[in-house]
Amino acid sequence: MKGKILILLILLIPFLLLGEERREYPCYLLREAPILDGKEEKAWENIPEATGFFILGGEKYAMEKQTYFKCGWRKEGIYLLIKCEEPSIDKLSARLKDGEELYREDSIELFFFPKDAPNYLHLAVNAIGSRWNEIGITGQPATPWNWQAKAFMGKDFWAVEIFIPFGVLGRKASDGEKWLINIARNLNTGPTSEHFTCWPPLRAGFHEVQNFAFLTFRERGLSFEEKGKIEEEINKPFYAFLKVIVEGLWRDLEKQAGSYREAISYGLGKEKLREEANYLNETWNELGKLRQRENPSLNELRSFILKYPNLPERFKEFNYKVLLEKLFEE
């Protein structure tokens, strides 16, 4: 376990060093303006999706409930589609209305710092589409400016679609221009460890401007093939992190392969151990197949990790059960 943590920290060092590399999202032109309804439609199909939100503190990724976003622009302003994983959709905290302190509920917070602007803009949207905004950090509710947000609740997620005119942002963007941005999430349904998450790996709070990500405007559209490659590049750090976990699980099991295989074989022949032996055997086989795949997707890696938590510990516990069973037989 210590080895895994060390590898993880090495992977994250570039993000943790103040003033060093920032995360960057390339914001491409939308071919058409999306219909604001919180749903993903054709207008978004060639815009890359980013994920890999960090738990506030910048050292760990959110694993149980991730967040995804797409961001594109047109001459009139910036559009965003943000999707929040939420299997406990009925437990959402989202009642406040426009202008109220939405960051206290299940919500998304957006921070934009346009190039050469004197201050940044802070916007918030809750899971029912209510809006809130301020300039800089005042913490005071304000009458929402002229920007739009619409929410949608699915079976195991909620989403918001947002349009922010350049007039609200204080200036228009141009090709190659870099703004600073933070996209953050307030999660009230648990786990408590993921209460505050954000796309840039911020340390102490969402207003940590010095560690915001870059939003780089690109004055062209993307083909579907280009979109896929850019999406892979954006999410490469999170993908690498998941690969490290999967490889670590495999190494842990292979170290005790002989003992574990023997325990599983024994357990399959015992009625009271058979169910767990089958589970562990199938899990091991599934892990092996996942590793053999040339390029498993990010979602496949994460799904396996979430589906089989505490895997090495379960194998160890089962091994002990088998040893005890054999002792009683004697």
What is the predicted role of each segment?
Residues 10-18:
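Hydrophobic h-region of N-terminal signal peptides that target proteins for export
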Residues 2-10:
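Sec-dependent signal peptide recognition
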